[in-house]
Swiss-Prot record:
GO terms for cellular component: plasma membrane; proton-transporting ATP synthase complex. The lineage of its organism: Bacteria, Pseudomonadati, Pseudomonadota, Alphaproteobacteria, Caulobacterales. The gene is atpG. The keyword Membrane applies. Keywords: ATP synthesis, Cell inner membrane, Cell membrane, CF(1), Hydrogen ion transport, Ion transport, Membrane, Transport. Produces ATP from ADP in the presence of a proton gradient across the membrane. The gamma chain is believed to be important in regulating ATPase activity and the flow of protons through the CF(0) complex. One of its GO terms (biological process) is proton motive force-driven plasma membrane ATP synthesis. One of its GO terms (molecular function) is ATP binding. HAMAP family: ATP_synth_gamma_bact. This is ATP synthase gamma chain.
Length: 294
């Protein structure tokens, strides 16, 4: 059994850890509010831009469709972008994204597809490099950025555009964590190329179907400009969702750690009191026995 001094040191150590986890929880909560506001503010812009592209795409057919919209006509070469965190202590936040990406990667490899990977965040890079080091073509460390803007997303979009225009990839898919609430963040796969123009954007396109528009310049020329911008915006929106999800996961993880530390302190304190009481009782018995012997 540990001595009383060792038990006191253990209790003090856990209390110090509890103070750290509590402070980290409060910091994560403050950053979560800012990150959540930024993510929610970016979504309407991203949705509206996608809706504009859907409306324009409805008037483009055949060979006039830009490459980012029409695609290459093949799906043999895939680029998987895995956006996760640069820091840890956030529960299973990064692991859930990497797990979803790995499932897609393994499926594509089993189908004989050529798979390339772009990693965003040191944690995703560390996990995927152990498994697919020969498939990673680029990795991005965003730990130096406190806020994500278009200037952060642009270099990532440039790499995607370069690989696509060089004919190295046919399909580009981004894996990230969709922020829904503090307790719900869902690993999500978003196809970036060929650009998707249906689904959530269909109602917006349908509303414009009743009117006939004449565009100057043409729809094709406008799309040639908007599609690269849309690529950057969709990546930025995913990064902002990721940041909010990371701080939500970290806040939850630190809250759980603080509670667990409290439980450990109670348990260690109880053990300490019992040991101290037993030691006092033993000393009293020795004193009484000695007095009776005299």
């Amino acid at each position: 059994m540990a001595s009383l001094k060792e038990m006191r040191n253990r209790i003090a150590s856990v209390k110090a850890t509890q103070k750290i986890t509590k402070a980290m929880q409060m910091v994560a909560a403050a950053k979560l509010r800012r990150s959540q506001d930024a993510a929610e503010a970016a979504r309407p812009y991203a949705r509206r831009l996608a809706a504009v592209i859907a409306n324009l795409a409805a008037g483009v057919t055949g060979d006039g469709a830009p490459p980012m919209l029409a695609g290459t006509g093949r799906d043999d070469r895939h680029l998987i972008i895995v956006a996760a965190a640069d820091r840890g202590l956030a529960g299973g936040f990064t692991s859930s994204i990497v797990r979803a990406a790995r499932e897609r990667i393994e499926t594509l490899i089993a189908q004989g597809k050529d798979v390339k990977i772009v990693c965003i965040g040191k944690k995703s890079t560390a996990q995927l490099r152990r498994l697919y080091s020969d498939r990673i073509v680029e990795d991005f460390d965003l730990s130096a950025y406190r806020q994500f803007t278009l200037t952060v997303a642009q270099p990532i979009a440039d790499v995607v555009t370069r690989l696509y225009e060089a004919g190295d990839v046919d399909v580009v898919t981004l894996f990230y964590s969709r922020f829904k609430s503090v307790v719900i963040q869902t690993p999500t796969a978003l196809q970036l190329i060929p650009a998707t123009v249906d689904g959530a954007n269909a109602p917006a396109a349908a509303q414009g179907a009743q009117a006939v528009y004449e565009y100057e310049p043409s729809e094709e020329e406008i799309l040639e400009t908007l599609l690269p911008r849309n690529l950057t915006v969709q990546i930025l929106s995913a990064l902002l969702d990721n940041m909010a999800g990371f701080y939500a996961s970290q806040m939850t993880a630190m809250d759980n750690a603080t509670r667990n530390a409290g439980d450990m302190i109670k348990r260690y304190t109880l053990e300490y009191n019992r040991s101290r009481q037993a030691q006092i009782t033993k000393e009293l018995i020795e004193i009484i026995s000695g007095a009776e012997a005299v």
